[in-house]
């Protein structure tokens, strides 16, 4: 069995973020939305968000100070933050959207905090098995079902030390801050390798 990476660091293939942007309309539209990427790592997701030009502001944060890099856009910030710490969220500015690939073993702690501190919604890249009603998330998921799932087929590869694809199915889970009266929309993304311009 392969060992877990330190801090659960598995960079997100850029094409998965392009697929998210192609599949979901983020409001406010027309370059007005603000975004926080709170588990930024080396910027795999935030670099695509910035390149897309769809957002007015993309701020980044990470628990590892070594992964915090200078902001490149006027008005943007990059800071050190433990996304499992309620106090860190309380000190942070509020954003329209939180978009990230959280460390899987910390996701149950991060998701409620991110959801409570976004204005419009959040998009989280998670294993599809996150839907299972485990003790550490069952109640929260029952009260906050996702508005949309974008499931990737074939499975993407997150580890450079494995051949082919990974052994777990992943999906973008999208929540809207003010309820979801239409149920959960399910989209199978079978052409994700054709999205965007990044590898």
Residue ranges and their predicted role:
Residues 1-199:
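Class I S-adenosyl-L-methionine-dependent methyltransferase catalytic core
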């Amino acid at each position: 069995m392969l060992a877990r990476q330190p801090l659960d660091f598995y960079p997100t293939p850029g094409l998965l973020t392009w697929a998210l942007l192609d599949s979901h309309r983020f409001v406010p539209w027309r370059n007005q939305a603000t975004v926080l990427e709170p588990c930024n790592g080396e910027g795999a997701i935030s670099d695509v968000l910035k390149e897309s030009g769809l957002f007015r502001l993309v701020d980044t944060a990470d628990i590892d100070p070594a992964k915090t890099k200078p902001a490149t856009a006027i008005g943007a910030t990059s800071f050190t933050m433990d996304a499992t710490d309620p106090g860190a969220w309380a000190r942070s500015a509020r954003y329209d959207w939180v978009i990230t690939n959280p460390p899987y073993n910390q996701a149950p702690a991060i998701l409620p905090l991110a959801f409570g501190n976004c204005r419009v919604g959040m998009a989280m890249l998670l294993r599809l098995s996150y839907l299972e009603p485990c003790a550490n998330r069952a109640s929260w998921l029952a009260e906050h079902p996702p508005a949309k799932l974008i499931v990737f087929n074939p499975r993407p590869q997150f580890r450079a030390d494995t051949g082919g694809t990974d052994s777990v199915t992943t999906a973008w889970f999208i929540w809207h801050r003010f309820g979801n009266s239409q149920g959960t929309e399910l989209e199978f993304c079978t052409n994700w390798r054709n999205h965007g311009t990044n590898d």
